[in-house]
Regions:
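Catalytic cores of secreted/periplasmic lytic hydrolases that degrade extracellular macromolecules
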Residues: 1, 5-53, 58-173
Length: 173
């Protein structure tokens, strides 16, 4: 079964309505979806929950961005295929890409997990993750550093790491 079919089946079998009115609820909703989706993957192919949450926070402004609200896109996932449903940036509607529209917010998380697991741009992420898996060491900072290519912001990975650290401190409270 292709990863696209698997993604669709997972989304069809688990389609929570992400209902949040504050940042804590946003975190809880993203975590619930990510936990379920990760359970559908081998342990070595899972994406750490706090990494997903941190990127969703930054890419969607806590689920409040236009792309999150109108397109259910929590992770800033772009498409260059004009056949895909997409939203263009309001300040630059003539760009050759758009942000992909998803049926649900959870579907955008599923797509993100599969993107990291299969897209050639994220081979460094997969390499670091498998190294950590076999050494029983989980270092989210090292994993986050492999995702510099994910965004145009040169400080992106530092922002993600800071947010991961804040989430981990929040979890300890």
């Amino acid at each position: 079964m292709s990863w696209i079919c698997k993604t669709l089946l997972v989304c069809l079998s688990f389609n929570p309505v992400m209902d949040y009115t504050n940042n804590d609820e946003f975190i809880d909703n993203v975590r619930a979806c990510a936990l379920h989706l990760n359970s559908m993957h081998a342990e070595s192919d899972r994406v750490p929950i706090n990494l997903i949450v941190a990127q969703a926070i930054h890419e969607s402004n806590w689920g409040k961005s236009r792309f999150a609200v109108e397109g259910n896109n929590l992770l800033g996932i772009r498409t260059f295929d004009p056949a895909d449903e997409q939203l263009k940036p309001l300040n630059n509607p003539d760009v050759s890409w758009g942000l992909r529209i998803f049926e649900t917010k959870c579907e955008s998380i599923s797509y993100y997990i599969d993107l990291l697991n299969h897209n050639h741009h994220y081979y460094k992420f997969r390499s670091e993750r498998i190294t950590q898996h076999f050494s029983d060491e989980i270092d989210l900072e090292k994993l986050a550093m492999t995702l510099a290519i994910y965004a145009e912001d040169i400080y992106y990975t530092q922002k993600i790491i800071r947010t991961i650290n804040e989430l981990e401190a929040y979890d300890r409270d």
